[in-house]
């Protein structure tokens, strides 16, 4: 039997993203040379929300893009097992990242493998001055030496739990961060 526990509702997510937006601005001493890059899929929508908050706070329209890490993963998935053709969705970074302070944005930080793949993909696009990481939820259990610079909420979990982020933009349900527990 699976039990679901909501650890962040829509209001908590909004507050966390507002706080993270302020932290990004403060740590970078403004928005000069700042860019946001969301990791497909939910990282894209979170990056867009951070972009909106930063625009509201600073009045500056920082560039925002998205990155597909499919070909950089060490657990590559395929759209067709017969042809072994990877399911690639494409990267959209419509600005020069060279010399920029890039904030990678993702929904959940777990093992660190997704972030490693995203950094590899980003370095193939250009050479940013800095790469920071913003996540909505950090659940621990790292396999690689990676940490988030900006965290919406730390959510300690056990190995048999899964953290799921639902966003109205992509999941067509209310915004929520849910822990799924196998019992």
Swiss-Prot record:
Span(s) of short sequence motif PRPP-binding: 102-114
EC id: 2.4.2.9
GO biological process: one example: DNA-templated transcription termination
Keywords: Glycosyltransferase, RNA-binding, Transcription, Transcription regulation, Transcription termination, Transferase
Record keyword Metal-binding present: no
Binding site for substrate: 41-42, 106-114, 139, 163
Matches recorded under CDD domains: PRTases_typeI
Catalyses which reaction(s): UMP + diphosphate = 5-phospho-alpha-D-ribose 1-diphosphate + uracil
Example of a GO MF term: uracil phosphoribosyltransferase activity
Domain of life, per lineage: Bacteria
Pfam family, one: Pribosyltran
Sequence similarity: Belongs to the purine/pyrimidine phosphoribosyltransferase family. PyrR subfamily.
Subunit structure: Homodimer and homohexamer; in equilibrium.
NCBIfam families named among the record's database cross-references: PRK05205.1-1 (NF003545), PRK05205.1-4 (NF003548), PRK05205.1-5 (NF003549)
HAMAP family hit by this protein: PyrR
Protein name: Bifunctional protein PyrR
Source species: Listeria innocua serovar 6a (strain ATCC BAA-680 / CLIP 11262)
